[in-house]
């Protein structure tokens, strides 16, 4: 209504609105008027750790009359669905903030303050956790014993340490830990280590994890399914949507992964499973039924644009780059064809090779490595990128 805008340019109204807006947020000037008593602050939002700016939130806590010793925050944006408090429970066991950062740091996440700071060990852990993390690194016998620790975070750390030590029985241990542990931090650690390092063996755990009782595990599981692309996961993926489609964040992850599986197979599986259900409100099912065919057509257009001789280099670059964040199985063959095409522009061939390096969680990445290992070209820049991609696909994740 026009009445809403009547006072839009009134000086008093502008002043009043600005005060309301100012009071809705916390600014560095507000913090400097306080005396913060928190020794360590973990910020889980964008820009709070922007130490490269003259004025920033983390600095306002550190350079203050208060008692804050260390902070952790992001310089720009925070990635979604991360696990920022992984191993946080070990702070109660006296783990140094620097060690906490070493095991949990994400891109653009920074520790500002004293990394040697630690709290008093009041968790009942009968060891120096900081000494163990350094002196016992690689000691399989020691960390296997910690699997029986009364602390859930210590059990999770034991799994991480055994992974770092390349323990020979790790895959079965991780599966056992996921299926049998009552602690969500242990289950999530097991799931992550399996999905990140053993994509060919993780299918059975992912099938279960998409309906885990802990919401973050469910969301991580759907994200890993998107990167794994194993067609065996399709029935469980559809079932998770029928069970959890009413959850906004779970639904968002499902729709983000809409191109993971063959669209026709996914549509048939959805119809098959939905036929056995009784719905109070089936609108969310109908939404996916309508979305799958639309996305199929959209993906076909994308591939047609890549193959079209009329497409510009910039257009093809844009399409190829999408498969870095969305490494779907259907894009592998087109990317390999671009790499092998000697008449194709060099920058597109290099980009295609680099993009395949993002398939490090793909269940059948061994086939990609095999294809790239047999590839030969006189173009040294392209060959260097192919070699880097092979190394990316073979590398171990933390």
Residue ranges of model-derived segments:
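Amphipathic alpha-helical scaffolding segments comprising HEAT/armadillo-like alpha-solenoid repeats
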Residues: 136-146, 167-178, 199-210, 230-242, ...
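Active-site proximal loops enriched in glycine and acidic residues that flank catalytic Cys/His/Asp
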Residues: 44-47, 73-76, 104, 115, ...
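C-terminal, active-site-flanking charged/polar segments
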Residues: 59-68, 85-110, 201, 214-217, ...
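Catalytic cores of nucleophile-dependent amide-cleaving enzymes
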Residues: 1-85
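Structural detector for internal amphipathic alpha-helices that build alpha-solenoid repeat scaffolds
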Residues: 131-132, 155-165, 185-197, 218-230, ...
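Caspase-like cysteine protease fold
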Residues: 84-168, 187-189
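Short inter-helical turns and helix N-cap capping residues of alpha-solenoid HEAT/ARM repeat scaffolds
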Residues: 150-151, 182-183, 213-214, 245-247, ...
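Amphipathic alpha-helical repeat scaffolds
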Residues: 144-148, 156-160, 175-179, 188-192, ...
């Amino acid at each position: 209504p026009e009445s809403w805008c009547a006072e839009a340019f009134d000086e008093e109204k502008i002043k009043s609105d600005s005060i309301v807006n100012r009071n809705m947020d916390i600014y560095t000037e507000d913090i400097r008027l306080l005396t913060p008593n928190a020794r360590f602050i973990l910020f889980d939002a964008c820009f709070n750790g922007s130490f490269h700016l003259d004025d920033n939130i983390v600095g306002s806590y550190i350079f203050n009359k208060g008692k804050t010793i260390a902070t952790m925050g992001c310089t720009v944006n925070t990635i979604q669905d991360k696990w920022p408090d992984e191993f946080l429970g070990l702070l109660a066991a006296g783990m140094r903030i620097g060690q906490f950062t070493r095991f949990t740091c994400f891109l653009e996440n920074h520790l500002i303050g004293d990394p040697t700071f630690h709290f008093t060990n009041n968790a009942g852990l009968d060891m120096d956790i900081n000494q163990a993390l350094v002196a016992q690194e690689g000691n399989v016998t020691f960390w296997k014993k910690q699997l029986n620790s009364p602390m859930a975070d210590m059990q999770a750390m034991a799994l991480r340490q055994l992974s770092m030590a390349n323990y020979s029985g790790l895959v079965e241990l991780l599966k056992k830990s996921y299926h049998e542990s009552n602690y969500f931090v242990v289950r999530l650690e097991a799931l992550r280590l399996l999905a990140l390092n053993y994509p060919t063996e993780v299918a059975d755990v992912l099938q279960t994890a998409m309906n885990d009782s802990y919401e973050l595990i469910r969301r991580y599981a759907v994200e890993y399914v998107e990167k794994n692309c194993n067609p065996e996961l399709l029935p469980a993926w559809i079932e998770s949507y029928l069970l959890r489609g009413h959850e906004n964040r779970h639904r968002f992850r499902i729709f983000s992964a809409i191109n993971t599986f063959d669209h026709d197979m996914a549509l048939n599986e959805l119809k098959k499973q939905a036929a056995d259900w009784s719905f109070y409100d089936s609108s969310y099912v109908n939404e996916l039924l309508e979305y799958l065919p639309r996305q199929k057509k959209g993906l076909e257009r994308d591939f047609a644009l890549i193959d079209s001789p009329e497409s510009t280099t910039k257009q093809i670059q844009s399409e190829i780059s999408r498969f870095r964040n969305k490494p779907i199985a259907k894009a592998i063959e087109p990317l390999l064809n671009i790499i092998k095409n000697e008449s194709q522009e060099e920058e597109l061939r290099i980009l295609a090779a680099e993009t395949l390096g993002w398939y490090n969680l793909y269940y059948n990445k061994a086939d990609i490595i095999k294809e790239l290992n047999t590839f030969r070209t006189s173009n040294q820049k392209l060959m260097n990128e192919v070699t880097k991609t092979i190394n990316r696909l073979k590398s171990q994740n933390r």
